[in-house]
Amino acid sequence: MSFAHYSEKIFSEHLDLFNIQWIYEPTSFPLKWGSGSIKMMFTPDFYLPELDVYVEITTMNQNLITKKQKKIKLAKKLYPNKNFKLINESQFYNFLNSDN
């Protein structure tokens, strides 16, 4: 499988290690519309069906973190029945180093 970023590959391998079922970029959520078309989409990196959560992985690039935080906030507002989680680099490494 091809991933957009190496951190997504590592995250998927750790999910596999813990036998956590995952689906890569399963759904795109429209966030903004205009002139009869979708102007902004949000496609979370992973969906974890057993936990019913959509996960977006982000690195330490502050511009990306801010953009993703805004998209997640808007997605939560537009899709309140969905569970979205942004995992930043430090949370990601804490997860990888945990003994779960």
Predicted regions: what is each one?
Residues 1-100:
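Electrostatic, structured charged patches in enzyme active sites and in nucleic-acid/phosphate-binding
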